[in-house]
């Protein structure tokens, strides 16, 4: 199973800046990318085509959208469809990121609709789940992960697993705060996610990649990736510079 190393560039970088960073990243790892690594870059929408173009000859790299709407087309101002993402060179899309849930107010049901529609349209999905500090302190970790995972995958058929889906566990309290869940917390959460995936998909759930996404940096990436049931990382701030993210990819 290849480790999935994903970069979420959020609302940063112009199209030109994103293209330059992607090209630099590919150059830094051109001769050193291990066979057990797969890299996905999630730039903002206007940078999708430039980044895809910069990576078109980069082995092991692909591009994804940060969001999607569950419709092929229509009167949905400001939205983007799976087909439009693929037209820009995307193979992946993020659904359920904590900033979409907590800043934009997306419901579990909308996340599930986006996930299923995207997979049916031909995209692969990184479904993000995770708890707030209030939920963790209230002892609701298992409840929250089960709800988000069950609703997020409600429309996903078993034959789509594991190739078309990955799950990113992102403790909300550790995103952009500089706080990092310790190894025991990461292992606990990822074990719960694995149990839920196996309960939902049987043997297929064993092979679904589970990523960790909470303030991953070059300094802690190797330790995190070595933990049980950690099959990659979803990186925010530390992925914005090619040198930093290349060190994480090669950790």
Curated annotation (Swiss-Prot):
The keyword Oxidoreductase does not apply. Its EC number is 5.3.1.1. Its main location: cytoplasm. GO terms for cellular component: cytosol. It catalyses: D-glyceraldehyde 3-phosphate = dihydroxyacetone phosphate. It is an enzyme of class 5 (isomerase). GO terms for molecular function: triose-phosphate isomerase activity. It comes from the Bacteria. InterPro entries: Aldolase_TIM, TIM_sf, TrioseP_Isoase_bac/euk, Triosephosphate_isomerase, Triosephosphate_isomerase_AS. Keywords: Cytoplasm, Gluconeogenesis, Glycolysis, Isomerase. It is found in: Cytoplasm. GO terms for biological process: gluconeogenesis; glyceraldehyde-3-phosphate biosynthetic process; glycerol catabolic process; glycolytic process. NCBIfam families: tim (TIGR00419). Belongs to the triosephosphate isomerase family. This is Triosephosphate isomerase. It comes from Nitratidesulfovibrio vulgaris (strain DSM 19637 / Miyazaki F). The lineage of its organism: Bacteria, Pseudomonadati, Thermodesulfobacteriota, Desulfovibrionia, Desulfovibrionales. The gene is tpiA.
């Amino acid at each position: 199973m290849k480790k999935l190393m994903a970069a979420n560039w959020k609302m940063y970088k112009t199209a030109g800046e994103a293209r330059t960073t992607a090209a630099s990243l590919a150059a830094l790892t051109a001769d050193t990318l291990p066979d057990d690594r797969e890299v996905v870059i999630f730039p903002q929408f206007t940078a999708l085509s430039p980044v895809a173009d910069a990576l078109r000859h980069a082995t092991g790299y692909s591009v994804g959208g940060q969001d999607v709407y569950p419709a092929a087309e229509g009167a949905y101002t400001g939205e983007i469809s799976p087909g439009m993402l693929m037209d820009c060179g995307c193979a992946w899309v993020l659904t359920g990121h904590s900033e979409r849930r907590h800043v934009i107010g997306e419901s579990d049901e909308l996340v599930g609709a986006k996930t299923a529609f995207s997979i049916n349209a031909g995209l692969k999905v990184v479904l993000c789940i995770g708890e707030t500090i209030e939920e963790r302190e209230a002892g609701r970790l298992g409840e929250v992960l089960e709800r988000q995972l069950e609703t997020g995958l409600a429309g996903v058929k078993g034959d789509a697993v594991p190739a078309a889906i990955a799950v990113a566990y992102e403790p909300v309290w550790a995103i952009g705060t500089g706080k990092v869940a310790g190894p025991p917390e990461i292992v606990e959460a990822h074990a719960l996610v694995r149990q839920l995936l196996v309960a939902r998909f049987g043997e297929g759930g064993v092979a679904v990649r589970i990523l960790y996404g909470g303030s991953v940096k070059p300094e802690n990436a190797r330790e995190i990736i070595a933990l049980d049931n950690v099959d990659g990382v979803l990186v925010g701030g530390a992925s914005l510079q090619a040198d930093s993210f290349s060190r994480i990819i090669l950790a």
